[in-house]
A protein has these predicted regions:
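N-terminal secretory signal peptides and thylakoid transit peptides that target proteins
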Residues: 2-17
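C-terminal segment of classical bacterial N-terminal signal peptides
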Residues: 20-25
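An N-terminal domain-cap segment
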Residues: 33-88
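Charged, gly/pro-rich active-site loop segments
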Residues: 36-41, 118-249
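Catalytic micro-motifs at enzyme active sites that drive phosphoryl/nucleotidyl and oxygen chemistry
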Residues: 52, 66-69, 100-103, 130-133, ...
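A generic structural signal for short beta-strands and their flanking turns/coil linkers
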Residues: 61, 75, 87-91, 107-111, ...
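A short mixed-secondary-structure module that forms the rim of ligand-binding clefts
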Residues: 80-123
Length: 249
């Protein structure tokens, strides 16, 4: 986000009480058909509400695409989310046409896309009780699993780029760049250098380790120090404060 105020407004919007603390699973159908979990999540740190996870994925859309066929490959890319396609949504993005990872993007091989949110070291000196305590690291993360496939239709590939650019131009506060006004011949040449793909999501896992299980005094101390920190710490403060605010009493 362009400012701390805007970023916190987004996070507060994400963490509505109804969305954050829905203890029901995504759905019985999802539980029966989802792949094995990729992430260890203690119950206190689980978030299962789909709208919240989607909001988080859109806010932190620069991801790690992880595949293991024919070898372990990890690529870091921006993405866009289509919430309406598939049971849990569809993620779209592109990698370099020269990237050997594209061999895994044929719709048959499993992949995990990792969305990382704010994170920070947490010092025991911030707690109200400072005996028998150790440091930790607080964070929010979402894993999306599926079987990505290359987009071979040129019009669909163009639409992916147009949507990705339009979304990020809006987030950057820019109004002067018009991708549609670029010469199509030039765009077609540039598109030869990318391998666009889409992945219908088979499973979503949300882990938000933000000290939910600690005492009120400990949580207050953590918030105080995060708020006084740098940009990274203040980003985590925004997410943590919103979570604490909407936590059931």
């Amino acid at each position: 986000m362009s400012t701390d105020v805007n970023r916190r407004a987004v996070l507060l919007g994400l963490l509505s009480a109804a969305a954050m603390w829905d203890e029901s699973p995504i759905g019985a159908q999802d539980a029966q058909t989802a792949p094995d979990p990729t992430l260890y999540i203690p119950r206190a740190h689980v978030v299962e509400e789909r709208a919240f996870l989607h909001d988080f994925m859109e806010e932190y859309a620069f991801v790690s695409l992880i595949t293991t066929t024919p070898a372990l490959r990890i690529t870091h890319i921006p993405t866009i989310l289509d919430r309406a396609r598939g049971r849990l949504g569809t993620i779209r993005g592109h990698i370099s046409a020269q990237n050997p990872q594209k061999a895994a993007l044929d719709g048959t091989h499993p992949a995990v896309i990792v969305f990382r949110g704010p994170h920070s070291y947490i010092s025991p000196s911030w707690y109200a009780v400072r005996e028998s305590v150790v440091p930790t690291w607080n964070f929010g993360v979402v894993h999306a699993s599926g079987r990505p496939r290359l987009i071979t239709d040129r019009d669909k590939a163009y639409d992916l780029l147009a949507t990705l650019i339009r979304t990020n131009e809006r987030r950057a506060g820019s109004t002067s760049y018009d991708f549609a006004a670029q010469p199509r011949e030039y765009v077609d040449r540039m598109m030869q250098g990318i391998s666009p793909f889409e992945m219908e999501i088979d499973a979503l896992e949300g882990k938000f380790k933000l000290g939910q299980e600690r005492s009120e005094g400990d949580r207050s101390g953590v918030l105080e120090h995060l708020k006084a920190g740098g940009y990274k710490e203040r980003s985590l403060y925004d997410l943590t404060a919103a979570l604490y605010q909407n936590r059931p009493k």
